[in-house]
Amino acid sequence: MEMWFSELHTSNVKLSMRIEEQLCSVESDCQRIDVLVSDEFGKFLALDGEILFSEKDEFIYDEMVTHIPMAVHPDVKNVLIIGGADGGVARELINYKCIERIDVVEPDEMLVEVCRKHFPELTCGLDDDRVNVYIQDALRFLRNKTGDYDLIINDATDPFGYTEGLFTKEFYGSCYKALKSDGIMVYIYQLVHQAIGCLDLLPRNIIRLMISDRRNGRS
């Protein structure tokens, strides 16, 4: 009997792929975690029924969110990755000898463990001596940070469920405070067909923050 995995994009559209094997299916305190194998994409990770990444194409995301800001900023030494349980972004960052510290803040410890077991080619990035992994809520972590980071990469998942707090005005304000004056922040913004429930949320919060900071004399 064939096994298929389907990811709903809208009520009328879904992506389906034939599954060769299911390697893992567990429930953490935060979400359901599945690792499956397909002929088309190899191993892939799904959280609450939505594909996070696959062996075939994860490099596209990890390289884009890493190397573009690194090419723009002249002197990155301290980096914060919010999320990043799979280690893919950290794996790209450790190639830069100028970086002195990489803090990875991920609330779901089980997700880190699953990724270490099934995606060691990615989580090797978490084993570098410069990388510190904190199993903690990112918003709480950020509240005590002021001017600590040259680069913040928001590698969290969609703005629903347990990560919803990472897509609020308070969160972006905390990120802004944690950045140095010339710091850069990179964040995920979904494709339109995936973002029906949050199209109004992210831009409004960011724009409000930018307007407030301009009025306070910081650009």
Task: Map each language-model feature to its residues.
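N-terminal auxiliary segments of SAM/dcSAM-dependent transferases
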Residues: M1-F44
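The AdoMet/dcAdoMet-binding core of the Class I SAM-like
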Residues: E2-W4, F53-Y187, H193-D200
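Ordered hydrophobic segments in well-structured contexts
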Residues: S6, F44, I184, R218-S219
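Generic structural "secondary-structure junction" signal
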Residues: E7-T10, E21, S25, S54, ...
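A short linear-motif detector with a strong N-terminal bias
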Residues: S11-S16, L23-S25, D57-Y61, I82-G83, ...
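Residues at the C-termini of beta-strands that transition into short coil/loop
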Residues: D39, D137, R218
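Short strand-turn-strand beta-turns centered on an Asx-Gly dipeptide
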Residues: D48-G49
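Substrate-binding/catalytic lobe of Class I Rossmann-like enzymes that use SAM or dcSAM, i.e.
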Residues: Q190-S219
